[in-house]
Amino acid sequence: MDKLNKLAVPAGEKFRKLQKMVHDIKKNESGIINKFKKFQNEQVALICKTGKDTWDRLKKKPPPSLPRRDYASEHADNEEEQWSDDFDSDYENPDGHSDSEMYVVPSEENPDDSYEPPPSEQEKKKIPSSFPISRGEYADNRTSHHQLPPINKPLPSTPSSALPRPKKPSLPSPAAKPKLPLKPRECSDDEDNYIVPVDNDDDNYIEPTESSTPPPAKPPVNRFMKPPAKSALPTPPKPSLASDMQEVYEVPEEEEELSPPPVTRFTKPLPATRAQNAEHSHMHSMTRESPKLDASRNILPLPRNRLHPKTDHEANNNDENHSFSNTQESKFPPGAAPSPLPRALKKTSNAVNPAKPCLPSRDTFTVNEDKPTAADRRRGSSHEFPLPPLPSGTPKSSLQKPLVLPKVPEAPSRALGTSPHSSISSISSTADQDAGVHSKAWYAATCDRKTAEDALYRSNKDGSFLIRKSSGQDSRQPYTLVVFYNRRVYNIPIRFIESTRQYALGREKCGEERFDSVAEIVENHQHTSLVLIDSQNNTKDSTKLKYIVRVS
């Protein structure tokens, strides 16, 4: 037992020490936490207080400061001193004192002192109000203006004296501050009549200023254009504007009686102009309906036929192509003819008016008889006979025929590849010989894009190809290489480079291969692979030209 007690005593002491240490630790920690919480609460309270102060300052705005007065007063000086003393602390107390001093004291002396700024503004408004009445309301108040001119004549000096008088009270208002409050009383009493600076007799002087002497002077300027009107005008304007308007109509009648020659001048040209207008209208209608228009429209295609063959002739250098372009393009100008028609009308009308209308129509339709002969090589000569009699009898029918012509060129344009005549075949044969494609097995002369693609799809062999004419019929891109590869058909344009007289595949690019003929392109790519680019799928393949496809 003794041993147990000896062992238990130190263990209990150690346990108590541990508890004490733990208690001290907890106590210290709680103190730190309490200090932190206390500091935090103090900061929060400070922030709340300052925030409340700022919020109050933002929410409760100080009263606005009073503007400086135009007049000097002893009370105002005292108030400024009070403002300077108490402005830092409170805004309410100085306002209370200033309000009591401002509005009570001047009301005892002069009740109108507090309302001095408004009348000064009204005085400013009076000056522009008198002027816009004369400028802006001259249309509405012409009766008042015409009733007043007799008053203006006996009193020429009064309006000049009335104008500076309203300016005087407006000018000293800022200068003499203490003296003004006496005058605004009259302004307040007579504001409606706008007679502030002038006596009761000034009504007669202000109205002429409103009527503004220049407006009545403007109508007499127009009336004084003739000398006899001067004697009659000064007497009538007294009664009213209606009388003025009546006299305006009476005076020219008197003038006509006094001076008959000017009346005859006005009366003679009037029927003459009407007759001339009628004659001119008939002449214009006759010229429009006459076959001269047909002549002008029939003459127009001729210079166009002379201009277009030059481009074809420069491109192909063949006389046969020149003759074919004449026959083919003789039908195109009527479609584009309406634009130069007015130019031709002006020329023909000036040249043909002295001559008879029948002669130019016959001459011009002889030219038209040559045109259908060239065009009838394709359509037949059945249209030659009705053309000469139609313009003389019915000009409208002749106008309709050139409109029908533009529809026809579609057939020859398509027929270039399908049913060529001897001239077309000779031109195409020379071009094919130059390109080296004439009588080649892989060249389909009369093949369009769809038939070529169908033929390649039927072959269904990678590397099968043929060459056809381009559907656009462009001299810079005369042929197209059609290649089948991987169940797709590629149409590769063959460009003709005019500067070097060579051929190349695809779009122009630096370092491209150029060949002297299309046959060389085919021979080259039968041995070397041809790059095929699919722009839709952004893929690139290559193949050689292996199998020739013939179109039946």
UniProtKB/Swiss-Prot annotation:
Tissue: Highly expressed in the bursa, very low expression in ovary and spleen. Expression was variable among B-cell lines. Highly expressed in immature B-cell lines such as DT40 and CL18, low expression was seen in relatively mature B-cell lines, such as 293B9 and 249L4. No expression was seen in T-cell lines.
Record GO terms (molecular function): lipase binding
Broad class of the protein's primary localization: cytoplasm
Keyword Cell cycle: no
Compartments in which it is found: Cytoplasm; Cell membrane
Domain SH2: 442-549
PROSITE patterns found in the cross-reference section: SH2
Post-translational events: Following BCR activation, phosphorylated on tyrosine residues by SYK and LYN. When phosphorylated, serves as a scaffold to assemble downstream targets of antigen activation, including PLCG1, VAV1, GRB2 and NCK1. Phosphorylation is required for both Ca(2+) and MAPK signaling pathways. Phosphorylation of Tyr-103, Tyr-194 and Tyr-205 facilitates PLCG1 binding. Phosphorylation of Tyr-115 facilitates BTK binding. Phosphorylation of Tyr-91 facilitates VAV1 and NCK1 binding.
GO biological process per UniProt: B cell differentiation; B cell receptor signaling pathway; cell surface receptor protein tyrosine kinase signaling pathway; intracellular signal transduction; regulation of cell cycle
A Pfam family recorded for this sequence: SH2
Gene3D superfamilies: SH2 domain
Any one Gene Ontology cellular component term annotated for this protein: cytosol
SMART domains hit by this protein: SH2
Comp. bias (Acidic residues): 77-93, 188-205
Skewed-composition ranges (Basic and acidic residues): 67-76, 277-295, 309-322, 368-382
Chain segments carrying region Disordered: 50-431
Modified residues (Phosphotyrosine): 91, 103, 115, 194, 205, 249
Cleaved signal peptide residues: none
Key words of the record: B-cell activation, Cell membrane, Cytoplasm, Membrane, Phosphoprotein, SH2 domain
UniProt entry tagged with the keyword Plastid: no
Oligomer status and interactors: Associates with PLCG1, VAV1 and NCK1 in a B-cell antigen receptor-dependent fashion. Interacts through its SH2 domain with CD79A. Interacts with VAV3, PLCG2 and GRB2.
Function: Functions as a central linker protein, downstream of the B-cell receptor (BCR), bridging the SYK kinase to a multitude of signaling pathways and regulating biological outcomes of B-cell function and development. Plays a role in the activation of ERK/EPHB2, MAP kinase p38 and JNK. Modulates AP1 activation. Important for the activation of NF-kappa-B and NFAT. Plays an important role in BCR-mediated PLCG1 and PLCG2 activation and Ca(2+) mobilization and is required for trafficking of the BCR to late endosomes.
PANTHER family the record matches: B-CELL LINKER PROTEIN, SH2 DOMAIN CONTAINING PROTEIN
Name assigned to this protein: B-cell linker protein
Provenance organism: Gallus gallus
Lineage start: Eukaryota, Metazoa, Chordata, Craniata, Vertebrata
